[in-house]
Amino acid sequence: MTTSNTVYLISGANRGIGLEFVKQLSERPNTVVFAGARNPQAAAELQALSAKHPGRVHVVELKACDEQGNARVVEEIRQKVGQLDVVIANAAICNDVQELLNVSPESMREHFDVNVVGTLVLFQAAYPLMKASPTRKFVVIGAKGGSITLGPEYRSALGPYAVSKAAVHYVAKKLQFENEDFVIFPICPGRVSTDMYLSAQSNDAELAKHPGETPAFSVASMLRVIDGATRENAGGKFMDVSGAVNEW
């Protein structure tokens, strides 16, 4: 069974950018969204969207690095709609705002597990079903702070987060090189006023100087890039919310 709809899977969809992706995609015709959350029962806004768009928004339990759980979600998608066209790997953490000199190994491992390994596990689980889609887009939410060219000179102290984003950028580029029939790329959403960014601002004087855009603005802009993305214009590149190509 397949459908004429475009089918999306969004990780980290219970709040912030992920939730906004679900909101905007759910308003599109011929679109089905599977919204991943660690605790679907507690994701009140996602449940409300599911009730508003029955059969078109599905809330699923999706945890970073959970191989069996990720595979179960993809199998659920296969059984319900028979295809998976676009995955947006949005789930991430940023809960240790300090310079690298003071970062613990445990914090580095936690950020790497969720932000890097979790993204790879999601791709591995989604791959068999995505392979059958003519669209085959796997989009990673990246960050300019993880640019090796730009990030080290930023004055904000986002050590473990930035390092993990640099690593997941490489994962995306390498996956594109290894999978020629996919469109795979990271995209920076810009500074966005999410709970995660506001929390980081409260612990970093430099970040506090830079107010974020609304999630609605950022996601609408990113969707324009994602919609128009091809292997030639975006695959294996570090895209920006503006549509420009960022430096690695």
Predicted regions mapped to residue ranges:
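Rossmann-fold scaffold of SDR-type NAD(P)-dependent oxidoreductases
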Residues: 11, 84-92, 115, 140-142, ...
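N-terminal Rossmann NAD(P)H-binding glycine-rich loop of SDR-like oxidoreductase domains
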Residues: 14, 18-23
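Conserved glycine-rich Rossmann-like NAD(P)H-binding loop of the short-chain dehydrogenase/reductase
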Residues: 26-45
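Rossmann-fold cofactor-recognition segment
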Residues: 50-68
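Conserved Rossmann-fold cofactor-binding substructure of NAD(P)-dependent oxidoreductases
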Residues: 65-80
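Catalytic loop of short-chain dehydrogenase/reductase
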Residues: 93, 97-112, 117, 131, ...
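C-terminal helical subdomain
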Residues: 181-182, 186, 199-248
